[in-house]
């Protein structure tokens, strides 16, 4: 979900990559959101639910007959699954995205920002059994707001952090209060940090040698930090965690063995951690 602009990279942010097409995400822009229109072209205003069900069933039968002749077609299989999901979503999506059903106390807890609204919807989605929710943050419609390489990293990041703070805190408190936090892993981060050296003005260049991600709930330890950077804040030097280690740990917390979870693609079995990755057990409660 995006509170405003579509994240740069678009499908690369929520596509299925080499996983089956059914695992691709559904992009939702919640700015100026109307619960029955959060996903474009989801509703068919010309047919009743019963008529749509008949059409969907007929098309599914035709597609399955075609699939039998092909024996295997990942895109067609994904299309069959996606069509059924779309049918079900047009009746369930408006309900789960209608935050007006929340109490005034809950809405006040989260705040009025678009990002806070996204955090509240994320909680509602988790309650309804959605397995993965990705929420991106921008401000003033600027889709790469955190890219302050040439901007004011001090004032800019302070503004961005303030815009996120209440919604994030509310999400964690709300999940815990409803008994959902222990079974919901919350991960906050990006793909790199910011270097300690100047970019000419007040900006900072990309730094992938050492940066911070935080995790909450879902079986991780509370109230501690893991690892450390050098004296300049440039490179991780203590308890270093590679992105493959992080992914292996997340999968472990989800009950999946990253060494055994494979998908067949282009003639070979792929792992989400490639041939790398170790579970960081020190992070696990």
Q: What is each stretch, according to the model?
A:
Residues 1-285:
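Ligand-binding pockets and gating/stacking loops
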